[in-house]
A protein has these predicted regions:
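Preference for intrinsically disordered or flexible, low-complexity segments
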Residues: 1-214
Length: 214
């Protein structure tokens, strides 16, 4: 198991995420939206009212290992991201976390080193339609640490006014707006799952979440 300690204060690369519609079956693979494929011991995370958090993506870490030369993430296993995003996808009756740092329970990151035996967790509306956006394919390439867009690692693209929230942290996942999904974060915003800059690379126990908006 890798236990490299990550350090802060120097320029690091990030990993750009490209997200593309596909007809391919992505069960058990890296994908954005769709249904999460979880180990038997894991449940789909819920908010404090018992409602399912929006499943954002799952990433097979083998897919990004060649781009992570500093070993800031494990190079085996799967990581899953969830957050309370229905409001920003057009459901104006859903809870809205606002700008700045969100409360615990409104987001969740899961990690498992073993992802050989996963169960697809499906969720449908009463009319039988999937209660999720269609799963989309993900590809990865190198990026600069402060780039906008969808990326792993690096630093948040939007920092002005949020310096206190970001101190001592680095971005784990950054998510930008996307017209194709009707996804907006107020006025030109981004969200970031944040982790301590100094940590072992398989430690996801202290994740925070921040919405940055101009």
């Amino acid at each position: 198991m890798m236990t490299d300690v990550l350090t802060h204060g120097h320029k690091t690369m990030a990993i750009k995420i490209n997200i593309l519609p596909t007809a391919e079956d992505l069960a058990g693979k890296s994908h954005w939206w769709g249904f999460p494929d979880l180990p038997e011991a894991f449940e789909w995370p819920c908010d404090e009212d018992g409602d399912l958090l929006t499943f954002i993506c799952q990433i097979s870490l083998e897919d990004i290992s060649e781009l992570d030369s500093e070993n800031r993430l494990p190079h085996k296993g799967m990581i899953w991201f969830f957050a309370e995003l229905d409001y920003f996808l057009g459901d104006l009756d859903a809870p809205c976390g606002g700008t700045g740092e969100w409360e615990p329970g409104t987001f969740k990151v899961l990690y498992s080193e073993d992802h050989s035996d996963l169960l697809t967790h499906e969720y449908y509306w009463e009319d039988g339609e999937p209660a999720v956006l269609p799963a989309e394919e993900m590809t990865f390439e190198a990026a600069s640490e402060t780039d906008f867009g969808f990326k792993l690692l690096g630093m948040p693209a939007m920092t002005e006014g949020y310096e206190n929230e970001n101190e001592g942290l680095m971005s784990l996942l950054q998510m930008d707006e996307e017209e194709r999904w009707g996804l907006r974060f107020f006025d030109c915003g981004t969200i970031n799952f944040m982790i301590p800059a100094e940590r072992t690379n398989d430690d996801f126990s202290n994740v925070s979440f921040c919405l940055h908006s101009s």
